[in-house]
Amino acid sequence: MMLTNRQIRVRLFESLKNSFFKKTVGISFALLFILLITAFSLIVVRFEYKLQLNEQKNLILEDTRLDEQWSQIVLEYSSLATPTAVEKFAQKEKMTLPTRKTIGFLNEQKEELNNE
């Protein structure tokens, strides 16, 4: 018995339709769909991981740079507080040590102001 092209197409379509609604084929398609979702999720997660890793590296570099700046600032302040630096500043501003006559106590000054 010879089948026509139309009959072959109809039987093939019915065969696909019947097999598609079977449990095994439905489960296979569901698993394929889950597999594709998982693969795309993995791609997204790895991309986000690389972005976060790059951000972490940038933050570590910035932390190192800020630590170096902090060390420089601490060194500058400590060098400004040395006795020689203070003495040079005092000479530049023409400062002198106070004499006994120029030293006054705050309590005495308040009393003088109150008496006036």
From Swiss-Prot:
Could you tell me the Gene Ontology terms of the biological process aspect for this record? FtsZ-dependent cytokinesis
Query: What job does the chain carry out?
Result: Essential cell division protein. May link together the upstream cell division proteins, which are predominantly cytoplasmic, with the downstream cell division proteins, which are predominantly periplasmic.
What is the name of the gene encoding this protein?
ftsL
Q: How does it sit in the membrane?
A: Single-pass type II membrane protein
Instruction: From the record, give the transmembrane residue ranges.
Output: 25-45
Q: Name one GO cellular component term.
A: cell division site
Residues assigned to the Cytoplasmic compartment are 1-24
Q: Which domain of life is it from?
A: Bacteria
This chain belongs to the protein called Cell division protein FtsL
